[in-house]
Amino acid sequence: MAYPMQLGFQDATSPIMEELLHFHDHTLMIVFLISSLVLYIISLMLTTKLTHTSTMDAQEVETVWTILPAIILIMIALPSLRILYMMDEINNPSLTVKTMGHQWYWSYEYTDYEDLSFDSYMIPTSELKPGELRLLEVDNRVVLPMEMTIRMLISSEDVLHSWAVPSLGLKTDAIPGRLNQTTLMSTRPGLFYGQCSEICGSNHSFMPIVLELVPLKYFEKWSASML
């Protein structure tokens, strides 16, 4: 969950998000080192009285500034590709949920059950209870089992939307006429909030997403009560 004045990411709740956090730290360190080197060279150029006006050719320098950036790019690309493949890999999901975007609400269908579907609308500010979050609470939460692989099928009934839950490392476009898929697995129970992340009209900011991750036995009780 995000909090005021937050400068970093939300706490990771899935293996994918943990990998993304490690990759961010890895890349940020490389950027920091490069920036420090560039600032150091600039400061030397501004303060030193030594100049090299007669240098016409420097093969060694050209070799270094060609090979070194290539190595740095490889160091960034390899872990990035690894995470991309991990995000696309879906092996034997335990549950499939179909998500449809609308202007301006979400519809969910548990395809493994015969008749388990519902719409999820934002609760207006005037109807919020004490302790509930403004513009983030919904009338029907998406209840899912924790520590299980879940496949999300995502599409749209009208315009472009984007189904995003930051703490799970999820962001998948909802495109009319196209069915995208992603996978999620939570390592701990709790409420996890997200929002539509694609400008979709005047009420774009009123399309929250709330996932309630619970142990399997509680999910089974909930699904039985919904049928």
UniProtKB/Swiss-Prot annotation:
Catalytic activity entry: 4 Fe(II)-[cytochrome c] + O2 + 8 H(+)(in) = 4 Fe(III)-[cytochrome c] + 2 H2O + 4 H(+)(out)
Function noted in UniProt: Component of the cytochrome c oxidase, the last enzyme in the mitochondrial electron transport chain which drives oxidative phosphorylation. The respiratory chain contains 3 multisubunit complexes succinate dehydrogenase (complex II, CII), ubiquinol-cytochrome c oxidoreductase (cytochrome b-c1 complex, complex III, CIII) and cytochrome c oxidase (complex IV, CIV), that cooperate to transfer electrons derived from NADH and succinate to molecular oxygen, creating an electrochemical gradient over the inner membrane that drives transmembrane transport and the ATP synthase.
Residue ranges that the UniProt entry lists as topological domain Mitochondrial intermembrane: 1-14, 88-227
Alphabetical GO biological process terms: ATP synthesis coupled electron transport
Top-level lineage group: Eukaryota
Protein name per the record: Cytochrome c oxidase subunit 2
Residues at which Cu cation A2 binds: C196, E198, C200, H204
Record carries keyword S-adenosyl-L-methionine: no
Quaternary context: Component of the cytochrome c oxidase (complex IV, CIV), a multisubunit enzyme composed of 14 subunits. The complex is composed of a catalytic core of 3 subunits MT-CO1, MT-CO2 and MT-CO3, encoded in the mitochondrial DNA, and 11 supernumerary subunits COX4I, COX5A, COX5B, COX6A, COX6B, COX6C, COX7A, COX7B, COX7C, COX8 and NDUFA4, which are encoded in the nuclear genome.
Cofactor detail note: Binds a dinuclear copper A center per subunit.
UniProt EC number: 7.1.1.9
Binding residue positions for Mg(2+): E198
Keywords: Copper, Electron transport, Magnesium, Membrane, Metal-binding, Mitochondrion, Mitochondrion inner membrane, Phosphoprotein, Respiratory chain, Translocase, Transmembrane, Transmembrane helix, Transport
Record membrane topology: Multi-pass membrane protein
Cofactor(s) essential for the protein: Cu cation
Residues spanning the membrane: 15-45, 60-87
Gene3D superfamilies: 1.10.287.90, Cupredoxins - blue copper proteins (2.60.40.420)
Residue ranges annotated as Mitochondrial matrix topological domain: 46-59
Record-linked CDD domains: CcO_II_C (cd13912)
GO molecular function: copper ion binding; cytochrome-c oxidase activity
Chief location of this protein within or outside the cell: mitochondrion
Phosphotyrosine carried by residues: Y218
UniProt-annotated location(s): Mitochondrion inner membrane
Protein residues bound to Cu cation A1: H161, C196, C200, M207
Any Gene Ontology CC annotation: mitochondrial inner membrane
Family under the similarity heading: Belongs to the cytochrome c oxidase subunit 2 family.
